[in-house]
């Protein structure tokens, strides 16, 4: 599964790591400056944005600053229960779901439209069409020509963004409350009335092809992650990159775009989330008058995708590249997700990732960076928010004269300790506190709240599930964390990836 990149030029989007603390992300820690950062490397990880011109390095810097602020603030947060938001959840007559999250602390409002379609729903041979449609949604309708929507948002001093993931595609704007009707009118118009001609399709296809060259072909880390995903998932469409395979993207045409748009872009396949200085009654009225006038789209079948066979092999992916200056290692496993888990399993995996590699207090950091001093970075993350089975990943980079094999062995040893001996009650409670405080901090943000609800509902959860999430985290037991590690983190079902400078690789380096 994947995480969205963001569309630059208008501030952090809900798809960007600095604005998505509600998503559990890859973390890395550097002893040289004492700061912590977050990033989606799958992204994480395999999602993409509207225009794709943001430097990955710049994003990393933004992430590091953001998480330092997040952790400082969150650790000082009140231990009291989360305040109850007066969240309203209702359906329009045409099947569009609406969530309203009032927050009257500032005169702004965030509108998000989540379509329950992502790259995992693409027809075979049409990879990248979901992301392509995201681009095309900015190209105009008969009523509003290309660029008018964005110009209007800029005129009123608002922000906008869009992102594509494996399970959803989302568009959002942040404006003043009096501009909400205008935003709804524009979004409703392009939901069903997009104009797609060859004059629009061909140039924009060139744009996404160039985006792939820039984002993936020129980035060894992205190339490795793409190969890792394709190896980790043997049958499920999560193995396909969100941006698409180049040879299939080159063949995308107007007919492909129209079929995808007509099938999935409809009110009964969308979720409207409005957070900010609004009340539910007013939002219901505006939604009825704008989105409510649209006809239903086709009634779609359940989102049943090809599932993974039982995995029973250790697989290795190694990429050597002269552009790599610092080697790195990561290892991934297919796991359950919040969309597929038995009761408590996904929560246990979230706590496992926190204890194993979730920060400077984690086992990986303390053992590899502080005690042994063999790693410059290291951590773990669980990509739990997906419709189908997801993944758990550990990672690290060697420090000084240390070898990448030493880092891998040390991380494997920490996993074995948890599998064999479990975790202590003290570290369990500390991990829960850190995790719940990060949720509290996320809920203090309009876009954070809108993102929490949108992603959850788009992947099969309910508004009640969102409200109960912190309580479910609090209920995790030490034995459940150990059981999750034992069940999912077997070395015989893993994919290990190595990113290496060309001169350091030998034919026998990664044979074990």
Swiss-Prot record:
Annotated Pfam families: Peptidase_M16, Peptidase_M16_C
Q: Which PANTHER family match?
A: NARDILYSIN, PROTEIN YHJJ
InterPro entries according to UniProt: Metalloenz_LuxS/M16, Pept_M16_N, Pept_M16_Zn_BS, Peptidase_M16, Peptidase_M16_C
Q: Which residues bind Zn(2+)?
A: 131, 135, 211
Family membership, please give it.
Answer: Belongs to the peptidase M16 family.
SUPFAM superfamilies (UniProt xref): LuxS/MPP-like metallohydrolase
- Any one of the GO BP annotations: proteolysis
Keywords assigned by UniProt, alphabetized: Cell membrane, Hydrolase, Membrane, Metal-binding, Metalloprotease, Plasmid, Protease, Transmembrane, Transmembrane helix, Zinc
Presence of keyword Iron-sulfur: no
**Segment Disordered: which positions?**
1-50
Q: What is the official name of this protein in its record?
A: Uncharacterized zinc protease y4wA
Residues annotated as the enzyme's active site = 134 (proton acceptor)
One cellular component term from this protein's GO annotations in UniProt:
plasma membrane
Q: Which cofactor does it need?
A: Zn(2+)
